[in-house]
């Protein structure tokens, strides 16, 4: 037992599940952690998974099952498993613990280790895995949402004397280990569970004894039995630590409230119940969740299929191949996730093939920005690669206080939306913003670019490429103007409507030029620098002809 100062806690703990069906159930996320962990501890259900872990791990792998002993209470073993993982975390290692199935379902050491690690100041998290319940849903093909579903551990069910709801599905785990506290499972107390089931469902109700197949050579067990059959020794002998019982609802208990159906749907109870809650049918060897194949409602739905058209708001996959691969790698690789969290700018800059819009979306680090790039309406897809175009109706880009701290540029790639009329940053403008760039053609309706107080400290340029919008009438920087700003540039032709460029106190010390290309706008009436005028300003350049009404450069 140990604790450490959070200042020096470089270790971490990740708990993951390997699933039930050998390697087939291991998620890509878990595999990525296996490949990047410093050390892997595991308790798995088969040797193939063990071999796969060892093949893919970069560091040592240790089997926690060695801590089990026939004469040891399981709880003590679980405490020791947790402590073994924690000791490696305390040594500063990136630790991965893998448990078969889902690591949070009937896994005591995983929860204990996570709780203690967090209390000691270490990073700790759990990754999901495929549980035997998930496996059961697929093999038995019943939907837990149709009738509702309750799940119990067999011993806990008996200890708590819980009343089983006969109107819904019930799942009972570990029926082969009723009342067992050590590693050796024996099933002498199954009869107590049978007594309980007969009390609630009667002796003739059908249940399913289920064991999901593990190895490719294994066969799934899904034996349909009467509850009274569970008293037979030859049946009970087939139960083991992996045995689960599925208890379907009683048919007669599956009824809707006619009054509530009317209130919710305004329809007859018979019509609604057939659509939302079909009666379960039971027969040995058949699938357990039979459906209404082609009743009147189903036939009408099938007939309507040929007339279906793609909805206007349906979105297709978009984004460049580079953006798609970036997001796939980000989802799968823990190391990339950490780098993205620490320094998104560096990671984005190092990724080739991203458009400026995609770069901006990644730097915002918001789910909405990613969906905006990757899920597009047909009208937004510009080419076969799915590169998006800016919507024609966009009239402004606005960042409210506080603007995202990591934003370093706002970039519009060709074509920019024709209706864009302003780009506005409300206080505080992000400290990392270094440029606002419009590529050809800049929107014709753009009339101002404004930065609220304080303007970003790192901003070094505002650039408009040809043609600059004819409607632009001002570029305004509120106090304080960023110290790193070194130029404001307008490419030919400079907008005819521009009437001022204004810098509020203090003007940036690094500003070295304000440049206007031919022709200089006829409407320009002033360039204003507030006190103090920047010491580094080396020119204000006007190409021929200069507007007659521009008398000079006022210095305030």
From Swiss-Prot:
Name recorded for this polypeptide: Methyltransferase/ribosomally synthesized type II borosin cyclic peptide precursor pgiMA1
| Record keywords, A-Z | Methylation, Methyltransferase, Repeat, S-adenosyl-L-methionine, Transferase
Task: Relate the protein's function as given in its record.
Answer: Fusion protein of the methyltransferase pgiM1 and 12 type II borosin core peptides; part of the gene cluster that mediates the biosynthesis of a type II borosin, a highly methylated cyclic peptide with potent biological activities. Type II borosins derive from the C-terminus of the fusion protein, and it is the same protein that methylates its own C-terminus using S-adenosyl methionine (SAM). The C-terminus is subsequently cleaved off and macrocyclized by a prolyloligopeptidase to give the final product.
Active site feature:
74, 78, 100
Task: Tell me which Gene Ontology terms the entry assigns under biological process.
Answer: methylation
Q: Give a Pfam family name.
A: TP_methylase
Q: Where is this region: Clasp domain?
A: 251-377
* Pathway in which the depicted protein is active: Secondary metabolite biosynthesis
What family is this protein classified in? In the N-terminal section; belongs to the precorrin methyltransferase family.
Q: What is its EC number?
A: 2.1.1.-
Instruction: Read off the InterPro entries from this record.
Output: 4pyrrol_Mease, 4pyrrol_Methylase_sf, 4pyrrole_Mease_sub1
Enumerate the residues binding S-adenosyl-L-methionine.
100, 102, 105, 174, 212, 243-244
Q: Where is this region: Precursor leader?
A: 378-386
Question: What Gene Ontology molecular function terms does this protein carry?
Answer: methyltransferase activity
Q: What CDD domains does this protein map onto?
A: OphMA_like
Superkingdom assignment: Eukaryota
Q: Subunit arrangement? A: Homodimer.
Extract the ranges annotated as region (Methyltransferase domain): 1-250
Q: Which sequence positions carry the modification called N-methylaspartate?
A: 421, 434, 447, 460, 473, 486, 499, 512, 525, 538
């Amino acid at each position: 037992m140990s604790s450490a100062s959070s200042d020096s806690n470089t270790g971490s703990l990740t708990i993951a599940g390997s699933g039930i069906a050998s390697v087939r159930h291991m998620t890509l996320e878990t595999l990525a952690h296996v490949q990047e962990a410093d050390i892997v501890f595991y308790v798995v259900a088969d040797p193939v998974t063990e071999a796969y872990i060892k093949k893919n791990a970069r560091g040592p792998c240790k089997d926690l099952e060695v801590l089990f002993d026939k004469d040891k209470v399981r709880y003590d073993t679980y405490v020791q498993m947790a402590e073994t993982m924690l000791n490696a975390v305390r040594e500063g290692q990136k630790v991965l613990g893998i448990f078969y199935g889902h690591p949070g379902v009937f896994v005591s050491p995983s929860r204990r280790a996570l709780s203690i690690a967090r209390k000691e100041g270490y990073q700790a998290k759990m990754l999901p895995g495929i549980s035997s319940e998930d496996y059961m849903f697929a093999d038995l093909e019943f939907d837990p949402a149709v009738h509702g579903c309750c799940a119990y551990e067999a011993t806990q069910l008996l200890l708590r004397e819980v009343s089983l709801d006969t109107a819904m599905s019930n799942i009972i785990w570990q029926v082969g280990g009723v009342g067992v506290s050590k590693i050796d499972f024996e099933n002498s107390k199954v009869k107590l569970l049978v007594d309980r089931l007969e009390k609630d469902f009667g002796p003739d109700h059908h249940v399913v004894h289920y064991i999901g197949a593990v190895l490719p050579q294994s066969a799934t067990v899904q034996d349909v039995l009467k509850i009274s059959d569970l008293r037979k020794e030859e049946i009970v002998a087939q139960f083991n630590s992996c045995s689960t019982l599925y208890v379907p609802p009683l048919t007669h208990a599956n009824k809707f409230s006619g009054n509530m159906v009317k209130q919710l749907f305004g329809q007859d109870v018979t019509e609604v119940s057939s659509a939302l809650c079909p009666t379960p049918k039971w027969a040995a060897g058949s699938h357990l969740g039979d459906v209404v194949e082609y009743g009147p409602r189903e036939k009408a739905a099938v007939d309507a299929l040929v007339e279906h058209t793609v909805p206007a708001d349906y979105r297709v996959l978009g984004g460049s191949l580079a953006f798609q691969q970036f997001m796939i790698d980000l989802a799968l690789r823990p190391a990339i996730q950490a780098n993205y969290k620490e320094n998104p700018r560096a990671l984005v800059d190092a990724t080739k093939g991203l458009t400026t819009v995609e770069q901006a979306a990644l730097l915002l680090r918001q789910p909405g920005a990613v969906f905006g790039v990757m899920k597009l309406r047909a009208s937004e897809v510009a080419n076969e690669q799915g590169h998006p175009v800016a919507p024609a109706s966009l009239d402004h880009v606005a960042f409210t206080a506080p603007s995202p701290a990591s934003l370093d540029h706002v970039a519009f790639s060709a074509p920019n939306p024709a209706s864009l009329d302003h780009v506005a940053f409300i206080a505080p403008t992000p400290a990392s913003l270094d440029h606002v760039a419009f590529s050809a053609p800049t929107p014709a309706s753009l009339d101002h670019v404004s930065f609220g107080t304080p303007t970003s400290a790192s901003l070094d340029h505002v650039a408009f490429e040809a043609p600059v919008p004819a409607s632009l009438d001002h570029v305004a920087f509120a106090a304080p103007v960023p110290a790193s700003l070194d130029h404001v540039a307008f490419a030919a032709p400079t907008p005819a409507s521009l009437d001022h460029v204004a810098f509020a106190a203090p003007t940036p010390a690094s500003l070295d030029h304000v440049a206007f290309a031919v022709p200089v706008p006829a409407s320009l009436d002033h360039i204003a620098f507030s006190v103090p005028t920047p010491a580094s300003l080396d020119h204000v350049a006007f190409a021929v002809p200069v507007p007659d009404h521009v008398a000079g450069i006022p210095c305030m």
